[in-house]
């Protein structure tokens, strides 16, 4: 006996998949854009994490708090797109590589920058968006 997946669930799965595919492509584009710089500091990952956190704050207000978009957009944008766009795993491995290669000062500043700037970005986005919408 097989159980059918409700149409609503299937739509949400597809919404996450669509958003995730677009977020992954956007993430890859940022990496490619920063590649020629050949910096020791992982600017591309920091950029997507801070920008993604800011956008998460904006869409949290628009979708969750104010319900200005249909709930399915939470799955497309917040779970799919921003989930794929931001990257904790890359941040983790880059931090480890910096530490292991003897660049512990850069590693520590990278970890602090990611955490402080990302949390600050989401807070600023929420405050600004609540005032503007």
From Swiss-Prot:
Subcellular location: Cell inner membrane
HAMAP family assigned: FluC (MF_00454)
GO cellular component: plasma membrane
Catalytic activity: fluoride(in) = fluoride(out)
Entry superkingdom: Bacteria
Membrane topology: Multi-pass membrane protein
PANTHER family according to UniProt: FLUORIDE EXPORT PROTEIN 1-RELATED
Positions annotated to bind Na(+): 83, 86
Gene (UniProt): fluC
Organism: Saccharophagus degradans (strain 2-40 / ATCC 43961 / DSM 17024)
Cited function: Fluoride-specific ion channel. Important for reducing fluoride concentration in the cell, thus reducing its toxicity.
Keyword Chaperone among UniProt keywords: no
Name of the protein in question: Fluoride-specific ion channel FluC
Keyword annotations from UniProtKB, A to Z: Cell inner membrane, Cell membrane, Ion channel, Ion transport, Membrane, Metal-binding, Sodium, Transmembrane, Transmembrane helix, Transport
Regulation of its function: Na(+) is not transported, but it plays an essential structural role and its presence is essential for fluoride channel function.
Family per similarity comment: Belongs to the fluoride channel Fluc/FEX (TC 1.A.43) family.
Example GO molecular function: metal ion binding
Family matches, as Pfam families: CRCB (PF02537)
Biological processes per GO annotation: cellular detoxification of fluoride
Listed transmembrane segments: 5-25, 43-63, 76-96, 108-128
């Amino acid at each position: 006996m097989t159980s059918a997946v409700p149409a609503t669930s299937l739509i949400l799965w597809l919404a996450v998949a669509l958003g995730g595919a677009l977020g992954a492509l956007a993430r890859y584009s940022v990496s490619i854009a920063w590649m020629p710089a050949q910096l020791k500091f992982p600017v591309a990952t920091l950029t997507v994490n801070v920008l993604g956190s800011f956008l998460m704050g904006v869409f949290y207000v628009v979708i969750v708090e104010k319900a200005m978009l249909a709930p399915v957009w939470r799955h497309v944008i917040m779970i799919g797109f921003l989930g794929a766009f931001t990257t904790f795993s890359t941040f983790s491995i880059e931090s480890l590589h910096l530490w292991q290669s003897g660049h512990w000062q850069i590693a520590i500043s990278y970890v602090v920058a990611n955490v402080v700037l990302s949390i600050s970005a989401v807070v600023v986005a929420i405050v600004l968006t609540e005032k503007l919408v």
